[in-house]
Amino acid sequence: MALLQIAEPGQSAAPHQHRLAVGIDLGTTNSLVAAVRSGETATLPDEDGQHSLPSIVRYTQDTVEVGALAALSSAQDPKNTIVSVKRFMGRSLTDIQTGEQSFPYEFAESENGLPLFVTPQGLVNPVQVSAEILRPLIARAEKTLGGELQGVVITVPAYFDDAQRQGTKDAAALLGVKVLRLLNEPTAAAIAYGLDSKQEGVIAIFDLGGGTFDISVLRLNRGVFEVLATGGDSALGGDDFDHLLQEHMQQVWQLGDIDVQLRRQLLIEARRVKEALTDANETEARIILADGSELKQVVTKRDFDSLISPLVKKTIASCRRTLRDAGVTAEEVLETVMVGGSTRVPLVREQVEAFFGKPPLTSIDPDRVVAIGAAIQADILVGNKPESDLLLLDVIPLSLGIETMGGLVEKVVSRNTTIPVARAQEFTTFKDGQTAMAFHVVQGERELVADCRSLARFTLKGIPPLAAGAAHIRVTFQVDADGLLSVTAMEKSTGVQSSIQVKPSFGLSDTEIATMLKDSMKYAKDDISRRMLAEQQVEAARVLESLHAALAKDGDLLNEDERGQIDATMANVAQLATGDDAEAIKQAIERLDEQTQDFAARRMDNSIRVAFKGQSIDNI
């Protein structure tokens, strides 16, 4: 007799069957894949024993080379060898072309303004290039683990916006891979150390990779990882150290203008010199020119430190700002976790130790810690650890809100709110008989829409034609675990609703976030004054419109003298509303309110008389 195996919905019918899932650190410079096997978490090496895969893709006429093979050709064929593609994810072609850094690639522009790489195999976008990096990692994992993966957790920088996160998901989708979750890189590091060390308290995650810098302050308590605040710079990393060293070598050798091939050769040598100076006080830089001549120079640790010191100071300044956002001091931080290969640079470790007052944690390989944390999370999400009560709470970097009358911003979800999150707020109509309402979703900390970032617009139609203020529209903001935002507006009496998922076309850099936060503090007093003025102007418009309608209907309840006084006061309110004195507008509205109270009472009495006309007491 056949037996039916019964399981809870969403759980495996074979509770002891180990499901295959991995964590992937899709890095700017290098990428890794890790898995939990026999209770141990480790990164998976390739056939040559290499754990990290260079995030480099080269397109030839017939093949696509990825990793070390592509890196070998990067100096000879820089135009078709795409390096650090993560920096292009979610950015517009205009952003790239107007940036400070030049690239050897030939670009084309897509219909939505995003960059396309011109290659021997045609046009490819950053999502497709990212998929080529994921492909060998997935193949490596399936070969090592002996089966098809049931899901992956991919890490992204904490400041990746919706477009960049969606692009990462799309890269996996091109390979038919199920993304269990996108995980912020600092949070992944916290998982790796939190589960291993069982720490409780406040920790800082200092993540300096090849192309991005993230600083996150987290509170760890009984398996709960709560991100208190995040900061950083999406255009600062080890690649920038390499470029500074490359320029230094170029100046010492007096090379002047150089072609892209020699520039790439210099960059490769600069990276080697940087790595050598991790353990040595000096090293020799050497390159061979096209004519066969050899150039040499000694580069000391002091030279290197002098070059990169301004960038390292920028990371410390970000740490200081983020601690302030989190409401904690450096002394309250129990441990500082170092993430990313660039944290191996001695000056970085020295500055971090000096700022936080204690040596940073480096017990887990900083190159592998993110992938290890992602693997632990993947193992939980795929159902191998149903007993785990691990909870992840990330935060949104900038407040989300709705535009209201007068160009004001009504914040619905505040900055640094933990995600996933859902927040709802009720709005109403401004005019009598209004049957539609336009919604403008914005992002930022300022009081006026003009000073915030526009995310999306949508319209709710089918609102019952009621008096102004009578309809109730509930607007719900939902931010999921991947940081993607959905906004829904619903009219409560009819249930009619409209919604939109916000996926900005263009990326929002950490520099822009920092600027928006600085501006919100710099202009706080002025913004409050402007908001108060706009609020009084909107209130004046509402009162005047309502009163005009009342006078048109029941103006005969007033004598000529009373009507004249009200008209004069209304004219005064209208005139003041065009000015910039919020208090004067407020006082004029209050005088108008006092002046029309008797008129309002007469209207009420008249309405009652009309309603009860012809009715007997028994009927009432």
UniProtKB/Swiss-Prot annotation:
The superkingdom listed in its UniProt entry is Bacteria
- Kindly give the Gene3D superfamilies that the UniProt entry links to this protein: 1.20.1270.10, 3.30.420.40, Actin, Chain A, domain 4 (3.90.640.10), Substrate Binding Domain Of DNAk, Chain A, domain 1 (2.60.34.10)
By its UniProt entry, which InterPro entries does this protein fall under? ATPase_NBD, Heat_shock_70_CS, HSP70_C_sf, HSP70_peptide-bd_sf, Hsp_70_fam, ISC_FeS_clus_asmbl_HscA
Question: Which Pfam family, any one, appears in the UniProt record?
Answer: HSP70
Keywords for this entry?
A: ATP-binding, Chaperone, Nucleotide-binding
Q: Which GO terms describe its biological process?
A: iron-sulfur cluster assembly
Per UniProt, what is one GO molecular function of this protein?
A: ATP binding
Q: Which HAMAP family match?
A: HscA
Give a short account of what the protein does. Answer: Chaperone involved in the maturation of iron-sulfur cluster-containing proteins. Has a low intrinsic ATPase activity which is markedly stimulated by HscB.
Could you say which protein family the record assigns here?
Belongs to the heat shock protein 70 family.
Protein name (database record): Chaperone protein HscA homolog
User: Organism source for this protein?
Assistant: Shewanella sp. (strain W3-18-1)
The upper taxonomy is: Bacteria, Pseudomonadati, Pseudomonadota, Gammaproteobacteria, Alteromonadales
